[in-house]
Amino acid sequence: MAKSHPRWRLAKKVLTWLFFIAVVVLLVVYARKVDWGDVWTVIRDYNRTALLSAVGLVIVSYLLYGCYDLLGRLYCGHKLAKRQVMLVSFVCYAFNLTLSTVGRRESGCRYRLYSRLGLPGSTITRIFSLSITTNWLGYILLGGIIFTFGIVQLPDHWYIDEGTLRILGIVLLLIIAVYLWFCAFAKRRHMTIKGQKLVLPSWKFALAQMAISSANWMAMGAIIWLLMGQDVNYFFVLGVLLVSSIAGVIVHIPAGIGVLEAVFLALLAGEHTSQGTIIAALLAYRVLYYFIPLLLALVCYLILESRAKKLRAKNERAMAK
C-alpha cells in the first residue's frame, strides 16, 4: 500500500496540471472573444445602487464568515472576546482568499494570531477544523439542492453532463443527511484524528453551521448577481459560483485567478448577457470581495500584532477565572 502513495501523488500532480492547462486554454479562448471596450463601458456605467448593495453584501458575507469562529468559540468553550475572534477571522479569511491555496496559509495565520492571543494549539486546531467543516457544509447543502434540481445548465462540450451533476447533487444531500444523523443519534461522540480529540456537535449546532454557511455562500452569489445587473437567474449564478469554487480547489491557484472567470464565461455563454458584462462583474467582484478587504486586513493584522502582548495578558487573566 505504501508503494502506491508516490504514484498516487504523481497522478494527482499530473491531473492538477492538466486541469490547470485546460483552464488556461479555456480562458485564453474566451479572452480573445471578449470585447474589452464593452467591459470598461459596463464598469464605468455601473448603477450606484447596485454597487452599494454589493458592498453591503460583502460586509454581510465577512460577518457571516466571522460567525464560523464564533461557533468555534462556543464549540471549544474558550473565553477570547467576541470582537477579537471576529477580527482574527476577518484577517485570516481575507488573507486566505487572496494569498493561499486550499486554506494552508489561513491555518498558519490562525495559529499565529490565536496563539499570540493566548489560545493553546489544540484549541486552535479545533477552531480551524470546525471553520472548514462549517464552510463546506453550506457548500454541500446548496450544491446538493442546486445540482439535484438541474438549475445549472452545462454546455454540450463541458467535462461532465447534467445527469452526472444531478447524481453528484444527490450524493451531496446524502452527505448532509448522514452528518445530521450522526450529530443527532450517534452514541460515540468522541473521536481522535491525528492526535486531536474531536467531539460531534448537537444536531441544533449542525443546523446552525449549515444555516450560517449557506447564507454566506448565498451572499457571495448575490454580489456577483447584482454586479451582472440581475440579467441572469440568481440561483443559476449561485450554482456557477459553486462549480467555479470546486474547480479553484482542484487547480490550487491563489484567489482562483482565471478559474472563476473561465467557468463563468463557459457556463453563462448561452445566457442573455454579454461577455463584457460577465468580465466587468467579476473584476468588480474581485476588487470588492478580495482586494479592498485584503488592504483592511493588513491594517488589522498590524494592529493585532502591535497589541498582542497586552491582549494576551488580559485574555489569560480572563481564562484563569
Description of each model-found segment:
Residues 1-90, 148-249, 275, 280-282, ...:
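Predominantly cytoplasmic-facing regulatory/coupling regions of multi-pass membrane proteins
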Residues 83-87, 102-106, 116-133, 273-284:
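Membrane-interface alpha-helices at helix entry/exit sites of multi-pass transporters
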Residues 91-100, 242-261:
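Transmembrane alpha-helix interface/packing and boundary motifs in multi-pass membrane proteins
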Residues 95, 99, 124-144, 247, ...:
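Membrane-embedded alpha-helical segments of transport systems
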Residues 104-116, 145, 254-269, 283:
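Re-entrant/interfacial helical elements at transmembrane boundaries that shape
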Residues 113-123, 240, 244, 262-278:
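Interfacial segments of multi-pass membrane proteins
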Residues 116, 120-157, 163:
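Hydrophobic alpha-helical segments and helix pairs
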